[in-house]
Curated annotation (Swiss-Prot):
NCBIfam families: PRK09559.1 (NF007110), ygfZ_signature (TIGR03317). Pfam families: YgfZ_barrel. GO terms for cellular component: cytoplasm. One of its GO terms (biological process) is RNA modification. It comes from the Bacteria. Its main location: cytoplasm. This is tRNA-modifying protein YgfZ. Keywords: Cytoplasm, Folate-binding, tRNA processing. PANTHER family: TRANSFERASE CAF17, MITOCHONDRIAL-RELATED (PTHR22602:SF0). Belongs to the tRNA-modifying YgfZ family. InterPro entries: GcvT/YgfZ_C (IPR029043), tRNA-modifying_YgfZ (IPR023758), YgfZ/GcvT (IPR045179), YgfZ/GcvT_CS (IPR017703), YgfZ_barrel (IPR048451). Folate-binding protein involved in regulating the level of ATP-DnaA and in the modification of some tRNAs. It is probably a key factor in regulatory networks that act via tRNA modification, such as initiation of chromosomal replication.
Length: 322
C-alpha cells in the first residue's frame, strides 16, 4: 500500500542531529502472541523473566532457552489484546515458534505469529506523540488498533493493525524512516538482538539479559534454568555482549560481519556482530559477544577489512544483575 512506501533511509553522520520525532517501519521485527486460559502459567515455565508478576502497564525483556540454557529468542514481553505479545527479530520466529510450542499440547494456550505492523517512535517528542494516542501513565498502553510499548526514554514500539498504521502515518508529520535508525538506538542502548543466525549460540548472561532485568532468579523452574542459575551462582559464564565501534572503508551489508582481536603480533577471530549500524562518514557500530575478561583497550578489526580497526565502547549499564 502507498503508506508503506513513504519510509526511507536516513543517512546520518556521527555529527548530525537526530529528528525530534521519527517513526520507523520495523519490518525486521515480528511478534508471537499467546492467548488462552493457561497462557500465564505456560509462558512462565518457559522463559527467564517473571511472567506472573508482569503488570498490565509494564513490559520486560526475556529469553527463551533450550534445555542446556542456549537462547532461542530474546524478546520484549507485554500484555497485548487478550494475551501476551513477544516482539523479537522476525528471522528468529520460525524456529522460536516451533520451540515455544513444544509442550503447549498439554495446556490451554494458542501460540502463533502475529500479522500486526510494528512501528518505532523515537525522539524528544515521542512521549507526547504516544500520549496523544492514550494519556494513561503506564509504559504499556492500549491504542487504536493495538498497543504502545515504551522501550526507554523517548522511544516506543507500536504494534497495530495495518489500517491503524496507515492512519498514524497519514496523519503524522514525523520523519518516516526505515529500520536502520531504530537499530542504531538499540545498539547505543546495548539491547541484545538474536536473529536466526545467532540462535542457540549463547546463554542469557552472555547477552546481558540479567543486567537488563530479563532474568528472575526467584521464579522457580523454567527451560534452561539450571544453566542460567549456575552461571550466576558459580560464575561459569565467561562472556558478555559489548558495543564495538570503528571505521569501515566500504558499505556493510546483512552478511555475517566477523571481527578479529589482536593477540601479540597476530590476529585471532573473536566473533560475529549480532547487529550493526553504519553512519554516512565511514563510522560504524555494532553489538558482539566477547570474552568478558578482555581489556577495554583491546584492538579489534574487521576480518573483511583488515585496515579498519575497532574498539570496545562503554556500556550504558552495569553488567551486575542485582
Amino acid at each position: 500500500m502507498e503508506w508503506q512506501t513513504r519510509f526511507s533511509p536516513l543517512n546520518l553522520s556521527t555529527q548530525d542531529a537526530l529528528p525530534e520525532l521519527s517513526i520507523s517501519r520495523l519490518d525486521h521485527l515480528g511478534m508471537i502472541t499467546m492467548v488462552g486460559d493457561d497462557k500465564k502459567s505456560y509462558l512462565h515455565g518457559q522463559v527467564t523473566c517473571d511472567v506472573v508478576s508482569l503488570e498490565k502497564d509494564q513490559s520486560t525483556l526475556g529469553a527463551h532457552c533450550d534445555a542446556k540454557g542456549k537462547v532461542w529468542s530474546v524478546f520484549r514481553l507485554f500484555h497485548h489484546g487478550d494475551g501476551y505479545g513477544m516482539i523479537q527479530p522476525k528471522s528468529a520466529i520460525e524456529i522460536e515458534l516451533k520451540e515455544i510450542k513444544k509442550y503447549a499440547v498439554f495446556s490451554k494456550v494458542t501460540i502463533e505469529e502475529s500479522n500486526d505492523v510494528i512501528l518505532g517512535v523515537a525522539g524528544v517528542n515521542a512521549d507526547a506523540f504516544v500520549s496523544a494516542l492514550n494519556e494513561d501513565a503506564g509504559d504499556v498502553r492500549i491504542i487504536n488498533g493495538g498497543t504502545a510499548v515504551k522501550v526507554e526514554a523517548n522511544r516506543w514500539l507500536l504494534v497495530v493493525t495495518e489500517e491503524a498504521a496507515q492512519a498514524l502515518i497519514e496523519n503524522s508529520d514525523a520523519t518516516l524512516t526505515t529500520r536502520e535508525l531504530w537499530t542504531r538506538f538499540d545498539i547505543e542502548s546495548a539491547l541484545p538482538f538474536v536473529s536466526a543466525t545467532a540462535q542457540n549460540e549463547h546463554i542469557p548472561q552472555a547477552l546481558n539479559i540479567q543486567a537488563l532485568g530479563g532474568i528472575s532468579f526467584t521464579k522457580g523452574c523454567y527451560t534452561g534454568q539450571e544453566t542460567v542459575a549456575r552461571a550466576k551462582y558459580r560464575g561459569t559464564n565467561k562472556r558478555a555482549m559489548y558495543i564495538v565501534k570503528g571505521v569501515t572503508s566500504t558499505a556493510l551489508n546483512d552478511d555475517a560481519i566477523e571481527l578479529e582481536r589482536s593477540v601479540g603480533d597476530n590476529w585471532r577471530s573473536v566473533g560475529t556482530l549480532l547487529t550493526h549500524y553504519q553512519f554516512s562518514d565511514n563510522q560504524a557500530m555494532g553489538l558482539i559477544v566477547l570474552p568478558n575478561n578482555l581489556d577495554d583497550d583491546t584492538r579489534l578489526r574487521l576480518t573483511s577489512q583488515p585496515d579498519c580497526e575497532w574498539t570496545i565502547a562503554e556500556l550504558p549499564y552495569s553488567l551486575d544483575d542485582e
